[in-house]
């Protein structure tokens, strides 16, 4: 088991990981919700950025490459009929890392091969923008 998700009413769920950490989701404002918490589709888009950075962290750790900073701004674009995520744009800031171009290229490739990206690649247009 990975988690337990409980419907709390008012289009809100509570999600509890086996380690005990908890998050709450809410339907977005444009789909009958209050927009007070991440929506389920927000979590999908955010999971992509988190997975991208986690895999880069693993890649760098295994190769003893210093990885001191990264920040990703996530933009999720929805489509309708049926309602779904059509696009995810990641704006990635790696400033402060002392990587040459060859290393950066390999690091980016590792991140783009993360499990969430592989899962989404045939269903969602993913764009990566680097600052």
Language model regions located:
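Alpha-helical metal-binding/catalytic segments enriched in His/Glu/Asp
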Residues: 51-52
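Extended beta-strand/beta-hairpin segments
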Residues: 1-46, 57-131
């Amino acid at each position: 088991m990975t988690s337990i998700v409980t419907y709390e009413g008012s289009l809100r769920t509570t999600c509890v990981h086996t380690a005990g950490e908890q998050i709450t989701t809410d339907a977005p404002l444009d789909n009958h919700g209050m927009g007070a918490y991440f929506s389920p589709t927000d979590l999908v888009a955010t999971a992509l950025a988190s997975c991208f950075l986690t895999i880069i962290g693993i890649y760098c750790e295994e190769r003893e490459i210093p990885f001191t900073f990264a920040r990703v701004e996530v933009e999720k674009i929805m489509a309708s009929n049926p309602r779904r995520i059509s696009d995810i744009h990641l704006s990635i800031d790696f400033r402060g890392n002392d990587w040459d171009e060859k290393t950066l290229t390999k690091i980016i490739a590792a991140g783009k091969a993360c499990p969430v990206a592989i899962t989404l690649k045939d269903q969602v247009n993913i764009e990566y923008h680097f600052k």
